[in-house]
């Protein structure tokens, strides 16, 4: 089976967890890991796994893209550098899967809108945020039944699972997630809150979703829609679980979720890594299947 060669940019918590997911993929083959700190644990792990590595940032990868056949790159760095990384790699015809909150490309939340990205020839798609991937399916499950005037999500993650890149991007995280609650989730107005909990031992990722419907909620249909959506998410994140709900209070629908990871890099409490990396891998696999079938051709975007 032919595999599409990939590069990972950013050997932090997300990049390292993603590497483990890609190594199991039937259609993706990770060949490069890009960092900026020669001593980083993530670069060492990637080298030990047989990947080529550079500590010179994306500029250290560019000369090797063509020779090594890299067609897809995952950016798990920071919103501040993503636009430049994307521009340089798009110019070489490499498609970007953006795991930062930069959101210069269209949002992708696989169980909600993955299929809509088929055949669109996009060279950059954005995976929103871990909080977005965990909660937007629930907002969408409600909005697919009836209009949602307001959607609010609260993502609680363990301090240990939140690396320096994510911490620098907190404002971008809340803005990007709120925007995707509207654009992908279907809420007229969206709001996002992230809580980084320093408790030891670290807590599992918890997510609370509140929706205010325009009309009186159709409880049976909303409940069925939520359970159906949970099954869709569980196809790629088995540890995605409903803890409580849906709870109905007037026009408010509340859902309380928990996300357990596979423990590929950080232990299972870090479900926030898994929901992001599994969604990114799932998205890239769809594009890789198109590339292998010859129905998608990547074209360089002039810088």
UniProtKB/Swiss-Prot annotation:
Keywords: Aromatic hydrocarbons catabolism, NAD, Oxidoreductase. NAD(+) binds at residues 161-169, 272. Transmembrane segments: none annotated. It catalyses: acetaldehyde + NAD(+) + CoA = acetyl-CoA + NADH + H(+). One of its GO terms (biological process) is catabolic process. One of its GO terms (molecular function) is NAD binding. SUPFAM superfamilies: Glyceraldehyde-3-phosphate dehydrogenase-like, C-terminal domain (SSF55347), NAD(P)-binding Rossmann-fold domains (SSF51735). This is Acetaldehyde dehydrogenase 1. Its EC number is 1.2.1.10. It holds the Pfam family AcetDehyd-dimer. Gene3D superfamilies: Dihydrodipicolinate Reductase, domain 2, NAD(P)-binding Rossmann-like Domain. The keyword Cell cycle does not apply. The keyword NAD applies. It comes from the Bacteria. The active site is at 130 (acyl-thioester intermediate). HAMAP family: Ac_ald_DH_ac. Belongs to the acetaldehyde dehydrogenase family.
């Amino acid at each position: 089976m032919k595999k599409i060669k990939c590069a990972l940019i950013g050997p932090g918590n997300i990049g390292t967890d993603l590497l483990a997911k890609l190594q199991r993929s039937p259609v993706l083959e990770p060949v490069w890991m890009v960092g900026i700190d020669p001593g980083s644990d993530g670069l060492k792990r990637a080298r030990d796994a047989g990947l080529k590595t550079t500590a010179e940032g994306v500029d250290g990868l560019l000369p090797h893209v063509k020779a090594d056949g890299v067609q897809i790159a995952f950016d798990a760095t920071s919103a501040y550098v993503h636009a430049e990384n994307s521009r340089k790699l798009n110019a070489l015809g490499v498609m970007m899967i953006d795991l930062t909150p930069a959101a210069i490309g269209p949002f992708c939340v696989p169980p909600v809108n993955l299929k809509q990205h088929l055949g669109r020839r996009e060279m950059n798609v954005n995976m929103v945020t871990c909080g977005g991937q965990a909660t937007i399916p629930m907002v969408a499950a409600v909005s697919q039944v009836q209009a949602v005037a307001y959607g609010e999500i609260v993502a609680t993650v363990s301090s240990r699972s939140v690396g320096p890149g994510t911490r620098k991007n907190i404002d971008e995280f809340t803005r990007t997630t709120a925007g995707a609650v509207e654009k992908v989730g279907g809420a007229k107005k969206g709001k996002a809150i992230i809580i980084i909990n320093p408790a030891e031992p670290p807590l599992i990722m918890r997510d609370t979703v509140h929706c205010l419907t325009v009309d009186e909620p159709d409880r049976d249909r909303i409940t069925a829609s939520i359970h159906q959506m949970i099954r869709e998410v569980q196809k790629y994140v088995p540890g995605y679980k409903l803890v409580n709900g849906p709870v109905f209070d007037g026009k408010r629908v509340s859902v309380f979720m928990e996300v357990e990871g596979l423990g590929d890099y950080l232990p299972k409490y870090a479900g926030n890594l898994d929901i992001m990396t599994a969604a990114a891998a799932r998205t890239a696999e769809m594009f890789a299947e198109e590339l292998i079938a010859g129905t998608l051709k990547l074209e360089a975007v002039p810088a």
